[in-house]
Amino acid sequence: MKKLTYEEFGKVMHNVYVHEYFPGVIRLGQAIFNSVYKYYPELANSLRNTGADCFYNDNKIIHFIDAILDK
């Protein structure tokens, strides 16, 4: 599975903070997962229900980012 470049990740995070993240309504983990899914659905789906799935648990955000970012 192709991972994201830093430029692609920047696009995802821009979308998070402009369109997806609403504190008190949508958690950051949900917003990040949804943004990745919007642009890269296969990549997001490959991490669903894994130890890196941050949709339900914000403590997994760093693991999600590690899994999607091509370092």
Locate each region found by the language model:
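C-terminal alpha-helical interaction appendages
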Residues: M1-K71
